[in-house]
């Protein structure tokens, strides 16, 4: 009997495994299609990735000729593999990143080789023991010094890779020279092949479809301004829609408002990396000054501070307690006009940076001040919504707290508190107390029993009050609580107007340092009235 049960269970397991295998085989085409779709999407989002991949392939093919062609191999030898390794390590997505790594690797190798040659020259005529001690001391001092220097922020940011290559090359040559006599010759050959690899990387990065980090940083700043403008307009339009939308999925990647300000919040590390790589690129202004890439980082920091208010504004759409839509409609026109003026300013700033010109002198027009004043007037015209209505309170009291939860809660608290106080004073009925203690009860026993009853009554009272106070927080006046969410929404719009000054100031300072052209009212008039559109996704290649 047990054998049959075992065979049956084995058969069921085999049948289940067969079904799972068939399911996986049937799902295989779908998975392959999904992978191919993702690969296609990567290239479609940024076609420069395809160009970079082709450049890497061509560079590796060129350095491989040092191994494949016999005349070149005889002249260089096995050190040709270092050229291949250099291309793999140095060739980056942007020209600035390639220059940074290439020059760091080249200079680090050259300086380390020169220092190792000097140490070899000094220790060559000494005895074997003294030479070993001298090499060991040099390795210790140089290793400790270079490692300590790597902790300096400026060196860590700009020359960390070069310091690492220097330390590696120096130890490789210095330590190997103690046992190998031809180590200097090998070092020369490796330096030549590394120089060949770096040269090929620089030629491919600077001359063949160059990708500039500075241009990426410039475009990303414009895209961030456009993204904030789009998010603000979309938030206000959705907040004042007459019909409520269906519940959306929790996937934030599909939220267009979130995608508008997401790049701003996540831009700190990308901006700093792009600014550093751009500082290595041979790009100058028309006055032959270095372009102020670091000031783009400051603009990004100010935009992040401004973006936090957009995040809070978006959060007003997701709160559990919402102002009724008829009540929102009372303030729709001034809010929409104010948001439109804010978006207009952001769009003008984006056009200013995109065209490398100063902002319009009338960027903060009277329309913004008028829209702000209209919103203030609209709010003051409805004081009962924000300060509460005494009439509503009287009606609620007349209906025994049915319409005003505070009254019912207060009555319930008073009732429970009176009951607790009654228990505290009496504890038990008078007759029961007298029969319980009797005429001969001692004073100490009576005092202890009284303290015990008071402690129990105080504990019960605290429990009652805590429960009822938590209800008071939630069950506030209905009319007052409905106006609170809109008050938060309106205050965030006003806060945006206040923070616009900081954004305008930083953009104008950037234009002054970068020598932007002056604003021409005739030429740039078409850029003043900018329509707010969803910004195109900018893919920045930072590795």
Curated annotation (Swiss-Prot):
GO cellular component, one term: membrane
Cited InterPro entries: ALMT
Classification via PANTHER family: ALUMINUM-ACTIVATED MALATE TRANSPORTER 10
Transmembrane segments: 56-76, 80-100, 106-126, 129-149, 164-184, 191-211
Gene: ALMT14
Family as reported in the entry's similarity comment: Belongs to the aromatic acid exporter (TC 2.A.85) family.
Compartments reported by the entry: Membrane
Region annotation Disordered: where it falls in the sequence: 416-438
Entry keyword annotation includes Transport: yes
Topology relative to the membrane: Multi-pass membrane protein
Function of the molecule: Malate transporter.
Any one GO BP annotation for this protein: malate transport
Protein's name in the database: Aluminum-activated malate transporter 14
First and last residue of the signal peptide: none
UniProt keyword annotations, A-Z: Coiled coil, Ion channel, Ion transport, Membrane, Transmembrane, Transmembrane helix, Transport
Chief location category: membrane
Coiled coil: 445-472
Composition bias type Polar residues, residue spans: 419-428
